[in-house]
Amino acid sequence: MVFDFLQPVSSSVEEYISTLSNQTLGKKVVLHTQTDFPVLENIALALITVNENRGAGKENKADDFEGFRKEFYRLYPGNWAVSMADLGTIEAGERIEDTYFVLKKLVEELVKKRIIPIVIGGSQDLTYAMY
């Protein structure tokens, strides 16, 4: 299954979220953790980070998704009631085409479930993999 390629959210992000106010986004989002994968029934938005930059002609260095998540989850939601899951990170494949394949299949699976994917990270070429 394509979800097997996702790396869970780090335990330090989980610990950070536990210190936040109950009104923050971090307390409203269902996380892919070391022990659990979110049930996607009733989920409207899915956050996915992609650790792939080779398409930009750069060395593939790891992005700071942990820092991004900590800043994002401390925010307060607006006047909306949308369910959201953080599915974790797609790590770079052995070849860039491997990453494209996983991202394409993951987006395809989410759209079939009527879940809007929010893809963070990677280079511009990943846009093509999503279509």
Roles of regions detected by a PLM:
Residues 2-131:
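Metal-dependent C-N hydrolase catalytic cores
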